[in-house]
Swiss-Prot record:
Pfam families: GAD (PF02938), tRNA-synt_2 (PF00152), tRNA_anti-codon (PF01336). One of its GO terms (biological process) is aspartyl-tRNA aminoacylation. The keyword Phosphoprotein does not apply. This is Aspartate--tRNA(Asp/Asn) ligase. It is an enzyme of class 6 (ligase). The gene is aspS. It is found in: Cytoplasm. One of its GO terms (cellular component) is cytoplasm. HAMAP family: Asp_tRNA_synth_type1 (MF_00044). It catalyses: tRNA(Asx) + L-aspartate + ATP = L-aspartyl-tRNA(Asx) + AMP + diphosphate. It comes from Bdellovibrio bacteriovorus (strain ATCC 15356 / DSM 50701 / NCIMB 9529 / HD100). PANTHER family: ASPARTATE--TRNA LIGASE, MITOCHONDRIAL, ASPARTYL/LYSYL-TRNA SYNTHETASE.
Length: 642
């Protein structure tokens, strides 16, 4: 009985689920028979090449390919198939009138196909420069449909599919050339890192996933213990104390690609679980770690991107904040922040005078060609500054002939406006944007505006990678909400030597001036890695915990094991952690971490594919001694009603 399209063929739509067909069109009563025959084919003929690996050097060779049907084109006497696997696509030519390739009549998108054939060079005029295998095609000798596919919810090659749909069917999206390339790059980076660090004397050591709750700023993911009722593990936010314990243990060069977990609000470049390239070294100083990591960076960029990275410049935290308003500046473009204090002091403009009297700042930037901004565009920029925390935004526009207009024209003379405009870096045809507020708020607002202008005005060269070390971070920062000093990085970061005694002596007057032996590696406005020299003396670590407001009881409960370890000959040590996901994101030139993770979460920390997190039954909760709160019960009830 010939196999033809029609009612019988629609098994792939679920109408004849118990019927399948062999290549000769025979109806088989069970899928088990088909599976056995398919596996016999796979056992007899092993794949010899990936689809995307073929080129003219293989012309004339017999090959066996296995993959998915990307596109099928029926030309009557011949059927053309674009066969896809993780390495790419190749065109396969089949004759549907031959028994060995008769099944080509029945192929549809995403069917799994095995092909034995001969590689042929395409004739001139028939080559496809859009794909890397475009100079060749495979002339099929025989083929086998290894499995059928339901009609997919979207074409794998379609780049305009709603992201939520792609995440729900992530296994289909992962077949795309885009995501295949990203995951292959990720693998290459992991292999490079392991090879480089191993060659430089590092040992890869795995640390526990079930560990003690030692909060590092974000909330912990907690895991109840069944065998120890009322007790909890925490999924580690980082292996911080563990890698320091390895230094105490004598493993003086450690690394791992560590899984980390943080229960925090998400952004485009954040996930609740993530990977970091974690390393620690003993008997070193800050320069040693920075030098080692520059070498690693150069190795990665040379081998993955073919780019030679030169010397990486350095900038202090204070300079980064003053010039760019942020501690991870994108230095691919200018539009730097300028200080207007000397110009506007005593100007009589109450807004500026009041801010300066409170110890605030008045600073501005110049938007290139912003002199043509409409009132609506300026209102949009003002709203943007307000969302960043600023009270408002002053603008000064210049026409092409240099004529100025401003939102504060009635408060300043034309000469003073011109002076302010020029101080912001403005030229004819530009627009100066000025913020007056406390230091942190003004920096945040101007940084937000600067990055917006960089993107909107196409000031950023996306083909460039601009690296930067940011150093000399504050050790501490004051939290108005908590009314106490908190660690800028984490409580294990060492102060610079000149501040160590102030820390031990609880010299509160020096807290705001203390600098840390900390360093961040920045690329294109992203913090790619961050680290520090660690506190390695017990009395300094205890002083840090006291400064942070931790009682002796709390310190012992959370970190008693670590303080005890510091008593037993701890060497000077330090380290760094790179965000693996962010690193690959930059290398793949995408702006979303979800694009470089196989199975990512959404911005609400959910997995649409597996529908998790999900409700568990009450027996499971009872086993681990957990009972849902009234709020959680109400949430579940509301979900069931919706």
């Amino acid at each position: 009985m010939p196999l033809v399209e029609g009612p019988l063929y629609r098994f792939c739509y679920g109408e004849y689920k118990n019927m399948v067909f062999d290549c000769n069109g025979t109806i088989c009563k069970s899928g088990a028979h088909e599976q056995g025959r398919h596996m016999k084919f796979v056992k007899e003929l092993k794949r010899t090449h990936y689809c995307g690996s073929l080129g003219v050097s293989q012309a004339g060779q017999k090959v066996v390919l296995m993959g998915w049907v990307d596109v099928r084109r029926d030309h009557g006497s011949l059927v053309f198939i674009d066969l896809r696997d993780r390495e790419g696509i190749v065109q396969v030519v089949l004759d549907p009138n031959k028994a060995e390739t008769a099944s080509s009549k029945n192929l549809r998108g995403e069917f799994v196909l095995a092909v034995e054939g001969v590689v042929r060079a395409r004739p001139d005029g028939m080559k496809n420069a859009k794909i890397k295998t475009g100079e060749v095609e495979v002339e099929a000798i025989r083929c086998e449909i290894l499995n059928e596919s339901a009609v997919p919810p979207f074409q794998v090659s379609d780049t305009n599919v709603n992201e939520m749909l792609r995440l729900k069917y992530r296994y289909l999206d992962l077949r795309s050339a885009r995501l295949s390339s990203h995951l292959i790059t990720r693998h290459k980076v992991a292999q490079l890192v392991r090879r480089f660090l191993s060659d430089n004397g590092f040992l890869e050591v795995e640390t526990p996933i079930l560990y003690k709750s030692t909060p590092e700023g974000a909330r912990d993911y907690l895991v109840p213990s069944r065998v120890n009722p009322g007790h909890f593990y925490a999924l580690p936010q980082s292996p911080q104390t563990l890698k320091q314990l390895l230094m105490i243990s004598g493993y003086d060069r450690y690394f791992q690609i560590a899984r980390c977990f943080r229960d925090e609000d998400l952004r485009a470049d954040r996930q609740p679980e993530f990977s970091q390239i974690d390393m620690e070294m003993s008997y070193i100083d800050q320069e040693d770690i920075m030098e080692m990591n520059e070498k690693l960076l150069r190795t990665i960029w040379k081998e993955i991107k073919g780019i030679d990275v030169g010397a990486i410049p350095r900038m202090t935290y204070q300079e980064a904040m003053d010039r760019y308003g942020i501690d991870k500046p994108d230095t691919r473009f200018g539009v730097e922040i300028k200080d207007l204090k000397s110009i506007v002091t005593g100007s009589g403009f109450k807004v500026f005078d009041d801010v300066l009297a409170r110890g605030g700042i008045v600073r501005g930037i110049a938007a290139p060609k912003g002199g043509s901004y409409s009132r609506g565009q300026l209102d949009k920029l003002t709203d943007m500054a307000k969302r960043a925390g600023a009270k408002g935004l002053v603008w000064i526009k210049s026409e092409a002939d240099g004529t100025l207009s401003s939102s504060v024209s009635k408060f300043f003379s034309p000469e003073k406006l011109a002076e302010m405009f020029k101080a912001c870096g403005g030229e004819a045809g530009d627009c100066a944007l000025v913020v007056a507020d406390d230091y942190d708020t003004a920096c945040a607002a101007l940084s937000t505006l600067r990055l917006h202008l960089g993107r909107e005005l196409n000031l950023i060269d996306n083909s460039k990678y601009k690296f930067l070390w940011v150093v000399d971070f504050p050790l501490l920062e004051y939290s108005p909400d908590e009314k106490r000093w908190v660690a800028r990085h984490h409580p294990f970061t060492s102060p610079k030597d000149e501040f160590a005694q102030d820390l031990v002596n609880n010299n509160e007057a020096a807290y705001g001036k203390m600098l840390a032996k900390a360093y961040d590696l920045v690329c294109n406005g992203y913090e790619m890695g961050g680290g520090s020299i660690r506190i390695y003396r017990n009395e300094i670590q205890q002083a840090m915990f006291r400064l942070l407001g931790m009682s002796e009881e709390e310190t012992q409960h959370k970190f008693g094991f670590f303080l005890e370890a510091l008593k037993y000959g701890t060497p000077p040590h330090g380290g760094i952690a790179w965000g693996m996901d962010r690193l690959v994101m930059l290398l793949c030139e995408t702006d979303a971490i979800r694009e470089v993770i196989a199975f990512p979460k959404t911005a609400k920390a959910t997995d649409l594919m597996s529908d998790c997190p999900s409700e568990v039954n009450r027996d499971q909760l009872a086993e681990v001694g957990v009972r849902l709160s009234t709020l959680a019960e109400k949430h579940l009830e509301d979900l069931k009603k919706s």
